[in-house]
């Protein structure tokens, strides 16, 4: 049961009362008088009684049907809703609490706090509507500062931008949510500041695990969490990202903070939009997606941006259906991102985590204009070695390694060491592997890969590079291996 929230009075007066004319799943048609029709995106409320308990259900106006009828999408289950029931127009869009009061609390898409003790009250002094305009063009500020994570494969080959949008792409079970949780842990340790997490259509168990891990790490009190899980109606899953983003915008625009916004999973946002579009009777577009896919994605992504002096840095997990990157959902998201981290099932199957594909992952600041020359040169050399190794795999599969030239044998040998060294022991995996997590400074990352590419570590066995932090760990492993084989 949701605890009582003590809020400041809304600035808008409530509108008129209508009547429910039809209920079809989460779609509710409501009739108003001609002079009291609610605006598009207005929040409507109705009382539903089931099992002796009465609860308030929020609806959002999605379209005007004519004949004084509006079609609304329910943000809660419609069980118990009946024709003829009264519906009140709130006169305003859905709004959510903003400010410091949100930190250390869990909310749903309509701003109800879910983790208060019975009888506890949350003092909310301000609420913002979730439908807002993106910042004006003259307020935007382009950022090119690198956001160091301490994860070797990311910092070297797909450097993140402070104030940028970062996408973690991957199919089912390759490590998107674990990597998001890892980033939350690292950001709290190394960067501080305020974070907002949006759980969009993901598993309730994962949300519960995340809250527990954040509490253990001591970062829960600096984070606002907004959840619309996969068992909730599509209207909730479609709006929860906007609710979380609104909270993040307040910290950016009013408190002038640099904010971190985590969204897991953007695909579920698209999927919810497709469900709502079908419920509203719109003609589907490519692969069954909604015809407004690009517009809906743009409305969300254009608000996630940096303004003069302040930024929202977002990490977005993006599920790739059937590992098909040409699917319209992930393809539409690509255009909005500053860095893309693609997680590979083939790399994950070899037990190399994080399973980042070094050849397909990209970043707009992987350029000597924005990063140090030695960083750029090392990244290019590493990619060249890995690309050449990939080209040689067919020859190796047919003829074997012995048929390669001496130069190609060296390339393959170094590529294998690089692949092993790209894996890293993470904090989130400590409880599974028993290996302590590590944060590797960028300087050490560049030095390590440069030495491998130069052949300075050709004498070290491949297994010494597996699941380690920096070169010190490699040397320690190599000494242990030599001792065991002596």
UniProtKB/Swiss-Prot annotation:
Alphabetically sorted, this entry's keywords are: ATP synthesis, ATP-binding, Cell membrane, CF(1), Hydrogen ion transport, Ion transport, Membrane, Nucleotide-binding, Translocase, Transport
- Output the superkingdom of the source species: Bacteria
Q: Which residues bind ATP?
A: 170-177
Q: Which family does it belong to?
A: Belongs to the ATPase alpha/beta chains family.
Description of how the protein assembles with itself and partners: F-type ATPases have 2 components, CF(1) - the catalytic core - and CF(0) - the membrane proton channel. CF(1) has five subunits: alpha(3), beta(3), gamma(1), delta(1), epsilon(1). CF(0) has three main subunits: a(1), b(2) and c(9-12). The alpha and beta chains form an alternating ring which encloses part of the gamma chain. CF(1) is attached to CF(0) by a central stalk formed by the gamma and epsilon chains, while a peripheral stalk is formed by the delta and b chains.
Q: Name one GO molecular function term.
A: ATP hydrolysis activity
EC assignment: 7.1.2.2
Q: Which SUPFAM superfamilies match?
A: C-terminal domain of alpha and beta subunits of F1 ATP synthase, N-terminal domain of alpha and beta subunits of F1 ATP synthase, P-loop containing nucleoside triphosphate hydrolases
- What's the catalysed reaction? ATP + H2O + 4 H(+)(in) = ADP + phosphate + 5 H(+)(out)
Query: What PROSITE patterns does the record point to?
Result: ATPASE_ALPHA_BETA
Where would you say this protein principally sits, based on its record? membrane
Q: What's the protein called, per UniProt?
A: ATP synthase subunit beta
Say yes or no: keyword Translocase present.
yes
Q: PANTHER family from the xrefs?
A: ATP SYNTHASE, ATP SYNTHASE SUBUNIT BETA, MITOCHONDRIAL
**Subcellular location per the Swiss-Prot or TrEMBL entry:** Cell membrane
Indicate how the chain sits in the lipid bilayer: Peripheral membrane protein
InterPro entries membership: AAA+_ATPase, ATP-synt_VA_C, ATP_synth_F1_bsu, ATPase_a/bsu_AS, ATPase_alpha/beta_chains, ATPase_F1/V1/A1_a/bsu_N, ATPase_F1/V1/A1_a/bsu_N_sf, ATPase_F1/V1/A1_a/bsu_nucl-bd
Q: Which SMART domains match?
A: AAA (SM00382)
Say what the protein does. Answer: Produces ATP from ADP in the presence of a proton gradient across the membrane. The catalytic sites are hosted primarily by the beta subunits.
* Gene responsible for this protein: atpD
Q: Which organism is it from?
A: Kineococcus radiotolerans (strain ATCC BAA-149 / DSM 14245 / SRS30216)
Kindly state one GO CC term assigned in the UniProt record. plasma membrane
